[in-house]
Amino acid sequence: MGFGPWIMRRANKLVSNSSAALLAVALNFLTPLQAAPAFANPLPACQKPVYLTFDTGHMGVAPLIAKVLRQHQVPVTFFGANEKTQEGDGSLGSHWASWWKERGAENHDFASHTFDHAYWRADLDGKRFKIRPSAGDNAGKDLNWGVADYCDNLKKASQRLETLTGRASLPLFRAPGGKTSPALIQAAASCGYAHVGWSPAGFLGDELSSQTHSNANLLKNALKNIRSGDILVAHLGIWSRQDPWAPAVLEPLIVGLQEKGFCFASLRQHPQYSKLLSEVSKTPNMGKMP
């Protein structure tokens, strides 16, 4: 996804003074949020939470990631885009439908990553944006999108995730690469989405070169630097990394953080979003997404 120099604590700026307006718009299209955890045993109260999130990718390590999460009963939030995959017709395609359905049954949470994995490149005049999708029919092309175009791509991913998982998508999104502008954030807020970044220590490094960033060093740095409240980000497969991150790092990272007293929570429990989501879930007669 190309985070590179964009590694920053965007999490501190995710909910602006327009949160009330964001909530009002969210109520117009969110389906009721489902409750009741599906993990085998009740999850303990989380005193030192970290928030593990996964963005889609080539899906080659997706089965392994699911197995580790299930084994350790770790709830996560998946941000979905229909990216090119090693097998099948895209990460949100029919080939992976059963995988997503299983994650929904396990009570993980889901949010938009833009359907076409659409990178923001620049703001243009007239509330428009230079966008370059890395998936879909226009992959690799620079497009001129208005607010409605961007919102449609956000909603398309949310709707597809709902179909695949049987769960309502959260009114959250992560821009590919974390690349945004204030104008893009405002555009997304106008159709009900709050942006989710990640914490500096939460950038787990799975898309960095394995020649310069070994799995052992990535694990060591994560265990050393992650703090309570951090949002962590990894991917369901990175094309460019020769030594895959998840098989070597995910399980020891989870175990190591738990041994240090950390616990895992969904973004549903994050203080920046929990109030918003609580108000959405309590509101009767909410309309469904168009």
Task: State where each predicted segment sits.
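Bacterial N-terminal signal peptides that target proteins for export
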Residues: 3-22
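Bacterial N-terminal signal peptides
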Residues: 19-32
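Active-site beta->alpha N-cap acidic-glycine motif
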Residues: 37-142, 153-170, 256
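C-terminal domain-boundary segment and adjacent tail
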Residues: 37-44, 76, 86, 242-290
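A cross-domain feature marking catalytic cores of carbohydrate-active enzymes
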Residues: 54-56, 78-83, 112-114, 175-177, ...
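Acidic-and-aromatic substrate-binding clefts and catalytic sites of carbohydrate-active enzymes
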Residues: 56-61, 81-95, 118-123, 172-182, ...
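His/Asp/Glu-enriched short active-site or ligand-binding loop at hydrolase and phosphoryl-transfer sites
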Residues: 179, 184-225, 262-273
